[in-house]
Amino acid sequence: MRERYLYLADTPQGILMSGQVPEYQFWLLAEISPVHSEKVINALRDYLVMGYNRMEACGRHSVSPGYFSGALKRFQRVSQTVYRLVPFYFPEAGHEVHRGE
């Protein structure tokens, strides 16, 4: 059985779930995400990697819940885009290449 290092291969359409994202994958996504605030990135890490609930993650890093939700949505969008790119780089990944929506 092939070991999987990236969580997106196991989730529907690249959706990230709280507490289930590997640290390495999180930092790769953070590199290409439009989120630049260190506080928000740390709150997202607490939520996605460490498994804190949204309020705990926001409280630990002094991030407003509304801003956190917007940043999480942008982060999810990056993950979903990466998911759609995978077949262009790894055709054996098993999901179809869509030429547009």
UniProtKB/Swiss-Prot annotation:
Gene3D superfamilies assigned: 1.10.10.2690
Gene Ontology terms: biological process: regulation of DNA-templated transcription
Organism: Escherichia coli
Protein name as catalogued: AFA-III adhesin operon regulatory protein
Keywords: Activator, Plasmid, Transcription, Transcription regulation
Its biological purpose: Regulates the transcription of genes involved in the biosynthesis of afimbrial adhesin-III.
Leader sequence segment: none
